[in-house]
Amino acid sequence: MKISIIVGGKFHAFNLAEQINKKKYLQQIITSYPKSYLKKYGVNKNKIYSIILKEILLKIFNKINFLNHIFDYNYLLCEYFDNKASDNINYDKVDILVGWSGFSRKCFIKAKKFNCIKILERGSSHIKFQHKILTDEYKSLGIKPNVPSSQMIKKEIEEYDLADFICVPSQYVKETFIKYGIKKDKIIKIPYGVDLKEFCVVESKKRKDNKFRIISTGSISVRKGSHYLLEAFKELSLPNSELIFVGSFDPDFKKIIKRYSNIKNIRFIKKQKQELLRNFYNDSDIFVICSIEEGLAMVQAQAMACGLPVICTTNTGGSEIIDDNINGYIIPIKDTQSLKDRIKKLYNDRRKLKQMSKSAYEKANNELSWEKYGDRMLNTYRGLLKTKKNI
């Protein structure tokens, strides 16, 4: 079995490549990251093709805030990567071609001439569902929507059709695909894992204070529902508490932040390297994520591995890894009252908080490693190849 991966970025592709490579099944990975970045994942340079210009241009364009409202540079960069990648895949040596959504249309078209299985990785909901739910949320806030363009929607829909299978991380995502006409037997559902060496309880680390600390990591944005957490925290006004966000701001969200600038016990910390992030988890009591739309936010498993109970919305995909009322709480999207109730419950009941923290840690360590994820993926790939041979 030989597997190749196409990914215009990082996502969880490098974790997947690491697990496939350990079993000697990795043929090739094409990415926009430099070859040196995959060294920590144990992938040999001769198995990597790097299209680094895509990543360089993306970083430059992202710094020019208004640019995306003038033209869809993200789509153009995806097209550039896709075209370049499609010319550098060893199609005749591949049994399974795994491509990330938005980067794989041309690759899959060329792959049709060869006898390989095409699997599309989609980490978020169906792009039409994503577009609608986010457009509605932006409009409700009076902000110009920052959503997938019509060009990107068309590209991804074509990828859905070209793929033999679509791999998603949660039941929530799977249901959005079914809603938009994708057959159930075309969808594979496998939740992501977490690096248990990188994210863990640091026993030697002592808390600097006894504040009840809520943490949220990842982008601070409309999509992540950060405004619902801000509003809930403001309304609760809990004594000796603190809310910290660790991550980068979406430019559009800065308008919303101004409404909460007078609250002293809210901190915004810039995006951190993965190896430093665990220190912030270890210095907190609970993790909260209020996403309007997601796939399976990997920060949830990170927080659990560091011993934090998670409060999440249904649309984070968290129900795949969180047991409601045992190691976290799952609430409806946009429900500030439910969010306040769950936060207050853990604030008032420290015994319950301790029990849930222990359960979260155990769940992550027993079930959520990348090794277990890799085993599930490889078993799925083997099953698909076996079925193909029997047809």
Identify the meaning behind each predicted range.
Residues 292:
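Aromatic "clamp/platform" in nucleotide-sugar-dependent glycosyltransferases that forms part
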Residues 41, 59-72, 114-155:
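Acceptor-binding helix/loop patch of EC 2.4 sugar-transfer enzymes
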Residues 324-325, 329-336, 345-350:
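Conserved acidic donor-binding segment of nucleotide-sugar-dependent glycosyltransferases
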Residues 206-224, 230-235, 244-246:
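Conserved donor-binding/catalytic core segment of Leloir-type glycosyltransferases
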